[in-house]
Amino acid sequence: MKGIIETAKTYYDNRESLIYTYRGRVLMRGDELYDSENDNRGRIDCSSYVHLALLGVPYEESPYVTGDVEGFFTMPCPWYPGSRGKEVLSIGKVFAAHSERGRDIRRASGLARYCREHGFELTPDESGSYDKVLQPGDLVFFEAAPSRLEEYIYYKIWMAIAHVGIVAEDTRYMINATGSSKHELNVKNEAIRYTRIADKGAPVLAARIKQDGTTGSKDVLIET
């Protein structure tokens, strides 16, 4: 399995084949994977990008190349080990289980909540900053922009979280899927970008998910 950063870079290298689309159902069953209005580029958003990296699925083996969304849903999800003594669930079952509980971890807010509830959340330093805590491959979560904050609060989006990125090798930056919130082609044609974390604002939560499902600090029992 490729590491998180190594996997994330394969999408950056193929960013011109992708288009950022915030539709809430990217990489979901029944979704249209390709954007027929924009040269059939693969649709991607911030959280689907993070899930692909966590699963160690490089671009060349992803549904964007194979066209096999169902195959993606049958993949084992090792970072979600399930309760002790049970086999590792597939990513499809993980998504479905949390969606049924109203905690859709396919989205950034649901994944952030999952990280807090199951021991993956990082503790900031005494000043409340994550700057000295972050390591490459960590996840950073951000609150909705001021123009949309009221909307996120109204719909009770957990912590009003609207975006997630992956901390890059230079920990001042994150690699993330980003772009216009509207369904349109990016002017710069870069669905995957390196963004200075400080330019996005202070993360409201950071987490470290190891691909084998451990936190590195304590043994976590996860109920399925």
What residue spans do the PLM features occupy?
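Small/flexible residues
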Residues: 27, 86, 108-109, 195-198, ...
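Short, structured beta-strand/loop micro-motifs enriched in basic residues and often containing a Trp
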Residues: 88-125
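N-terminal capping segments
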Residues: 1-91, 145-151, 159
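Aromatic- and glycine-rich peptidoglycan recognition patches
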Residues: 67-77, 82, 95-96, 116-131, ...
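Intrinsically disordered, low-complexity sequence elements enriched in Ser/Thr/Gly/Pro
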Residues: 13, 21-23, 99, 105, ...
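Structural motif
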Residues: 135-139
